[in-house]
Amino acid sequence: ATWIALATLGLAAAVLALIGLGDLPLRDFDEATVARVALELHQGLGEAPLLPTLWDKPYLNKAPGLHSLIALVIRATTQSDELPSEWSIRLAPAVLSCLVVPLGGWLQWLLRPGDRSSALATSVILLTLLPVARHGRLAMLDGTQLTAMALLWLALLQLNRSRSSSLWGAVAGLMTSAMLLLKAPLLVPAAVAAGLALAWGREWKSWNNRPAALLGMVLGLAPGVGWHLWHAHIRGSEALWLWGGDGAGRVLLDAGEGSDLGWRVPLIEVLEGGWPWLPLLPFALVWAWHWRQSRWGRWSLACLITLGGAILPLRTQLPWYSHPLWLPIALLCAPLLAWLVERPLASKRAPESPNPPCRWLLLRLPMFWCGLGLLLLLLELVSFSSIGGSLVPYRGLAVVLGLGWCGGGWWLRSAAPQRRRLGVISLSCGNVAALALLFHSPLWLWELNETWPVQPVAALARANPGSKIRLKGYDERPSLNWYAEQRIERFKGGPGRRLSDKPQKDCITEGQAGRWSLANCR
């Protein structure tokens, strides 16, 4: 029954991931870049097989693991003379990313054997978190990387309880390869986290067949290591740029654009995206520390501390860099959520885990959730007034979240376990319904509203073929390049054709799209 429930939650995540998947254009970072690299892989433009390019130049930012899968989808869904649709670009990352929902529950099942409630709660938390659901459906590497990391940890946990040591060793090796072919530098903290947890509990001593497990790992590592060796063989010292100049070296040493807040960026992302489960985290950290000698305590603390220690000091901080933190956060918070539902039953079912700390405060969390739900419903009412006009687009989200959280908090206060289960269902359904509404609207890709739309400008560039076009007054935009099917770099002076949203004097206008014009200037 546990596996059926986990599979059902995984199916729900897949349905959620596909809602409105192709309705909005690709955003600049990093969807349009990923799409272009995938298209050039499909077209075979590299100097050798499996070597990625971007506008016919070597692409040295990431290995082509996900790009290659997107290229396969493009081959299956797109005519050779067509630009691939947004749906075909986002499909592979969306499907792969939603696998973290059942895998997270399975991981918890291994950390807390027999604790079905905590396993299901882990999957529920991963299903309902906005950052996990939203970043997973973008044509980016972060969601797929989270799934690979979950399966890597799961395979390592299986080695001391399974007779199929070589199989699980191979799975661990393959997931290491997968991470090498996604964001390769992130493999280091993910592997260190697992190694710390294994060393803390000396778990490798109980592996059933260490030679078979290690052989499986080596075989599984072959694809990832093989590609990097192939890359180095063809491109020489340029291949090191993937690790140093444009990989770990850049994010460790160079404070890129949008990194003004430094280490606060991942903390802000967690504070913004962790609702409604975020209030459980402080209690969970204390509880896990009290039981740091248990497998759950060791792994959840080691993984969160190691990943947090790797992410917080980065000089370049972008919102999606915090994405790996959501898996250990879910592993930490889920047993507390299960305890809120089952209370005395939880300590009997998992006798090695005592009641959590500060129970008197923890038991007041349902009222807090209920209050948040009422506040959201109040904001929905305010949206009908003259002062709440800006809230109108969020009215439906406020209603479903408010009802879900208010009802969930109220039922979780009940003395009856059945009503408390209904409370968790209400909280979860409120979040899932809100995510479904969000993904069915233009609101889910809010970065598109932060600057001008590229598609009319791209159509203007496509309709007027000729010599190279430059973009005046703005930095180069990968999404404009994608839809224009040509690279349009920033204008830095001199004669030539240029796009601008300002009047272009002493130029020959070749086309107009709204306030934008394409002109040939001398």
Regions found by a protein language model. Give the residues of each.
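Transmembrane-helix signature of polytopic, membrane-embedded enzymes
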Residues: W3, L9, G104-T128
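Membrane-embedded architecture of ER/inner-membrane glycosylation machinery
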Residues: W3, S166-L174, W207, W287-R522
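Extracytosolic helix-loop segments that constitute the early lumenal/periplasmic catalytic or substrate-binding loops
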Residues: L18, T33-P58, G65-S68, L72-Q79
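Transmembrane-lumen/periplasm boundary regions of multi-pass, lipid-linked membrane glycan transferases
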Residues: V34-G44, L174-L182, L187-W296, C303-S322, ...
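Short acidic/glycine- and proline-prone juxtamembrane loop motifs at membrane-interface regions
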Residues: E86, P93, R134-Q145, A184-P185
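Transmembrane-helix motifs of polytopic, lipid-linked glycan transferases
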Residues: W87, L91-P113, L151
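Specific aromatic-rich, kink-prone transmembrane helix
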Residues: L103, T144-S162, M175, I329-L332
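Membrane-interface transmembrane helices that cradle and orient dolichyl/undecaprenyl
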Residues: W109-G114, L152-V171, M179, W289, ...
